[in-house]
């Protein structure tokens, strides 16, 4: 009979009192974690900015609004800005004065500068926005200048050889936004408004010819280079302020998501 008494003791030890102090649920009413949303203001830039690292490039005719958009995206999303290398280009003014003499030289200059941009973008550990793509030069400007007689067959072939060699291992944009402005008058008005001295000689026919090449450029980007492209008609939309600005930023955010 001593054995049953030994069994009863363990039962009394495992009695419910110990679980009762499981007043550990008391800490659960700690609604402290929900306060973490207060950290959201870290995104002082814009809450809809893409979270992962992105390389976005902007394409479009001269005066289409790429520079304005690139600066705005840099400020709104916190992207590193890579401006079009126009201001520092030593051949640009001569080019618009005598296109036949300076077209090949200018295209090589732009190619070298844009490849340098791509190398820098590869080393930057944040999202980047580039004002004008590397691909517009071989697919639009070089072909157009050759068609106008400003580049010889030999110069065009040599340019493409340089392009193939220099762009072989560069990082490509994740996405490209192509700005479309059908009206040459709007382009000319924007060019005059920004007042770059070296662009004063740009004529209506030159811009109209470029527009023809930009029509097929998005398809070339996707099929030849495997880069996704969003086409935006910005002829009448003012993306600098108000509702136009918000709609533009929302479109870009959705495109990059």
Question: What name fits each language-model region?
Answer:
Residues 71, 75-114, 140:
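Conserved substrate/cofactor phosphate-moiety recognition/catalytic segment
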Residues 46-53:
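Phosphate-binding P-loop
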Residues 66:
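Conserved lysine of the Walker
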Residues 61:
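P-loop (Walker A) phosphate-binding loop of NTP-binding proteins
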């Amino acid at each position: 009979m001593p054995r049953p008494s030994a069994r009863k003791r363990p039962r009394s030890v495992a009695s419910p009192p110990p679980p009762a102090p499981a007043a550990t649920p008391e800490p659960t009413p700690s609604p402290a974690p929900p306060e973490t949303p207060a950290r959201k203001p870290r995104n002082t830039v814009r809450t809809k900015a893409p979270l992962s690292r992105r390389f976005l490039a902007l394409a479009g005719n001269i005066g289409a609004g790429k520079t304005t958009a690139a600066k705005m995206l840099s400020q709104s999303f916190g992207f590193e800005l890579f401006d079009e290398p126009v201001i520092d280009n030593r051949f640009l003014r001569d080019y618009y004065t005598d296109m036949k003499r300076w077209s090949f030289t200018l295209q090589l200059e732009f190619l070298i500068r844009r490849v340098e941009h791509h190398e820098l973008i590869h080393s930057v550990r944040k999202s980047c926005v580039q004002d004008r793509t590397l691909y517009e030069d071989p697919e639009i400007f070089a072909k157009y200048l050759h068609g106008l007689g400003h580049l010889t067959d030999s110069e065009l072939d040599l340019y493409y050889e340089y392009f193939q060699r220099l762009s072989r291992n560069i990082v490509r944009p994740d996405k490209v936004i192509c700005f479309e402005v059908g009206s040459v008058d709007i382009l000319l008005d924007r060019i005059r408004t920004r007042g770059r001295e070296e662009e004063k000689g740009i004529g209506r026919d030159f811009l109209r010819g470029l527009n023809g090449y930009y029509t097929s450029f998005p398809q070339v980007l996707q099929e030849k280079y495997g880069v996704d492209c969003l086409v935006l008609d910005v002829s009448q939309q003012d993306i600098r302020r108000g509702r136009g600005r918000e709609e533009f930023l929302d479109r870009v955010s959705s495109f990059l998501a």
